[in-house]
């Protein structure tokens, strides 16, 4: 959960946390508003798992490109967003809402354009945000109705190392 444009924006992990313990969400909201301090975890084993996960994801991305698929990577480094308010050459404050909206727009543009693969797809409606490692284009069989994008749709492909979530 994060505060964007003055409102809380939730992600799937927030929903999972709430289902596990409703009090956890209340603590997260309190930390977001500065009422309590959020605990910081420093666990080298989690860092190692994250590193291996990113390496695995990178290999999968390389495999998709090697197959000749058109891959559109959604940028999340803020380069697509130039927030207003820079003065005297100082950088403007990071605008998470603008970055999420830009990434979600890039995702929809890639899907409408018929990309074979959308890497790091982003979804954002102002209240919820989500990310998919990969969206894979699936062409429709003859006679199947078109989706909002055309005679194809997209399926989510996740590259988690775990077998179960």
For the regions a protein language model found, what residue spans apply to each?
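Metal-dependent nuclease catalytic cores that hydrolyze phosphodiester bonds in DNA/RNA
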Residues: 1-151
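A conserved hydrophobic secondary-structure block that centers on an alpha-helix together
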Residues: 149-165
